[in-house]
C-alpha cells in the first residue's frame, strides 16, 4: 500500500516539508524481489568484531567469505554489515568490547545496513554472572535497533550454543541479508537439539518440496505461497469456498494447487490428510496462516464471536496437526510455521479472543519443539505487527497512520516481509532454530 511519507521523504523538497511539519521521515527499505542467491551477501562491505574468548568468530568469518561479503579494510567506506561475536562476554568488564566495536561505526553505517550480534546462550552457563552478561546483550541489541531503525537498518541477536556454531550460516544469511527488511530488535536461539539435515545450503534447497499454506487466497498467506513458489516449492493453497475466485487466481499465477476447505469443519483434518497422501504422499512444509478477528470489548462480545476466533485460530490448527503428525504425513526434517501476532505478545484492546489464540500458538510451538526434535522437525511462530494489507487500508486514517509509525523504522511492513521470514524458517539452514517466536514488526513499540 502507498505511504505518502516515504514518497515525500525521497525528494529534497518533500523531505524539507516533512521536517518542517515535524513528521517522521521514513527511508525506502531495501527488499528482495527474487529467490535466494547462491552468494546472499555478495558485494556487501562487512566488518566483524569479537569479544575476548569469543568462540564463534572463525565460523562467522568463513560464513561471510562463502556468502560473498567483502571484508572492510578501507577507511571512509560505509559498512553494509556489522557482525559482532559477543560469545566471550562473561562479565560486565567484557561489555567494553561492544562499545569499542560499535561506537566508531554509528555515524558511518550505511542506510539499510544489517547488524547481527552473536551471544552465548545464558542457559548454558552455570555461572550467574556469565549468564547475566549474556542476557544483557539482548537489551543492548534492542536499544541499538531503535537507534538505527530510522536509517532502515536492522539489528538482531542470535544466541548460539557452543555445539551449534556450525549451524549459524542460515541465521547469518538471513539477518545480514536483504530479506530481513522488517525483522529487527529480535533474538533467536540457535541450538543443536534438532537433528540436522545433511546439507545446510540455502540456495535451491527447497526445490521440489511440498508445502501447504492455509488462508492463502490473499494477504500474508498469498505472499507466503508466492515466496515459496519462487524457491520451486510445490505449494498447496488452502482457503474457504467463499474465497474461491481469489484462491484460484493466486494458484494460476504461481503454479500452485488450490484446495477449497473450511478448516473448522469436522472432517477437515481428514480431508487435508487424504488430499496430501493422494497427490504427494507426504508433506515437507506446513504454514498455518488462516485466522480471523472478531473485535469487541469483552463486555460487548457475543459467544459466537468468541467461539469463531478460538475455533479457526487455534482449535483447527491443533486438530490438523494431530492428524498429520499421528499419520506420519509430515516428513522427517519438515518445517512448521504458525502465524501468531503482536497481539499475542502485548495484548490489544478489544481483542481478548484474538490475543488469547495468538498467545496460545506461542506456547504451542515452544512445547512442541522438543517433542519433534528427534525427527529433525523445526517448529516456530511468526508474529507480524502492522502489515500493509487490504484490511489495514480500511482502517480510519489516523489509526492507520499511528499504527504505521509506532516502530523503529517508522513505517508499515509488507506481506512479503512476513513471507521472507516464513520462507527462511522453512530452509535447512534454519535447523538450529525451533520453538522460537520471531516478530515481523519493524520493532514495534508495544510488546516485548
Indicate residue ranges for each PLM-predicted region.
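Conserved glycine-rich Rossmann-like NAD(P)H-binding loop of the short-chain dehydrogenase/reductase
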Residues: 69-74, 233-248
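Substrate-binding pocket helix/loop in short-chain dehydrogenase/reductase
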Residues: 72-74, 94, 297-298, 305-306, ...
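Active-site helix of classical SDR
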Residues: 133-137, 321, 357, 365
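Short, small/polar-rich loop/turn modules that mediate ligand/substrate recognition or access, typified
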Residues: 149-154, 182-185, 373, 378, ...
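Short C-terminal tail/terminal secondary-structure segment
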Residues: 184-208, 434-448
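Residue(s) in the substrate-gating loop at a strand-loop-helix junction
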Residues: 341
Amino acid at each position: 500500500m502507498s505511504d505518502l511519507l516515504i514518497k515525500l521523504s525521497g525528494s529534497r523538497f518533500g523531505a524539507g516539508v516533512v521536517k518542517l511539519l515535524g513528521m517522521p521521515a521514513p527511508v525506502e527499505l531495501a527488499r528482495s524481489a527474487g529467490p535466494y542467491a547462491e552468494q546472499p551477501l555478495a558485494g556487501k562491505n562487512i566488518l566483524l568484531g569479537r569479544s575476548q574468548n569469543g568462540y564463534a568468530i572463525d565460523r562467522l568469518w568463513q560464513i561471510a567469505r562463502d556468502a560473498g561479503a567483502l571484508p572492510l579494510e578501507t577507511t571512509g567506506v560505509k559498512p553494509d554489515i556489522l557482525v559482532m561475536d559477543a560469545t566471550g562476554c562473561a562479565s560486565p568488564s567484557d561489555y567494553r568490547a561492544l562499545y569499542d566495536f560499535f561506537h566508531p561505526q554509528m555515524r558511518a553505517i550505511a542506510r539499510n545496513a544489517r547488524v547481527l550480534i552473536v551471544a552465548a546462550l545464558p542457559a548454558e552457563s552455570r555461572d550467574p554472572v556469565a549468564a547475566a552478561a549474556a542476557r544483557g546483550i539482548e537489551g543492548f541489541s534492542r536499544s541499538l535497533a531503535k537507534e538505527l531503525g530510522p536509517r532502515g537498518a536492522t539489528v538482531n541477536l542470535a544466541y548460539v550454543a557452543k555445539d551449534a556454531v556450525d549451524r549459524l550460516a542460515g541465521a547469518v544469511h538471513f539477518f545480514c541479508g536483504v530479506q530481513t527488511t522488517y525483522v529487527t530488535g529480535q533474538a533467536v536461539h540457535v541450538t543443536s537439539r534438532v537433528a540436522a539435515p545433511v546439507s545446510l545450503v540455502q540456495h535451491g534447497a527447497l526445490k521440489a518440496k511440498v508445502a501447504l499454506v492455509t488462508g492463502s487466497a490473499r494477504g500474508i498467506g498469498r505472499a507466503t505461497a508466492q515466496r515459496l513458489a519462487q524457491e520451486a516449492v510445490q505449494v498447496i493453497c488452502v482457503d474457504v469456498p467463499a474465497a474461491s475466485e481469489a484462491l484460484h487466481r493466486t494458484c494460476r499465477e504461481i503454479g500452485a494447487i488450490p484446495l477449497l476447505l473450511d478448516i473448522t469443519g469436522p472432517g477437515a483434518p481428514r480431508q487435508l490428510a487424504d488430499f496430501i497422501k493422494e497427490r504427494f504422499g507426504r508433506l515437507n512444509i506446513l504454514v498455518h496462516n488462516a485466522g480471523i478477528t472478531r473485535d469487541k470489548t469483552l463486555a460487548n462480545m457475543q459467544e459466537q464471536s468468541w467461539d469463531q476466533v478460538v475455533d479457526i485460530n487455534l482449535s483447527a490448527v491443533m486438530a490438523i496437526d494431530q492428524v498429520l503428525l499421528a499419520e506420519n504425513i509430515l516428513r522427517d526434517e519438515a518445517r512448521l510455521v504458525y502465524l501468531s501476532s503482536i497481539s499475542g505478545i502485548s495484548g490489544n484492546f478489544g481483542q481478548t479472543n484474538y490475543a488469547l489464540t495468538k498467545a496460545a500458538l506461542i506456547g504451542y510451538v515452544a512445547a512442541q519443539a522438543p517433542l519433534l526434535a528427534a525427527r529433525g522437525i523445526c517448529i516456530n511462530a511468526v508474529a507480524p505487527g502492522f502489515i500493509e494489507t487490504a484490511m489495514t487500508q480500511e482502517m480510519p486514517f489516523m489509526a492507520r497512520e499511528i499504527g504505521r509509525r509506532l516502530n523503529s523504522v517508522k513505517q508499515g511492513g509488507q506481506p512479503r516481509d512476513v513471507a521472507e521470514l516464513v520462507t527462511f524458517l522453512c530452509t535447512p539452514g534454519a535447523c538450529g532454530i525451533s520453538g522460537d517466536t520471531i516478530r515481523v514488526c519493524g520493532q514495534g513499540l508495544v510488546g516485548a
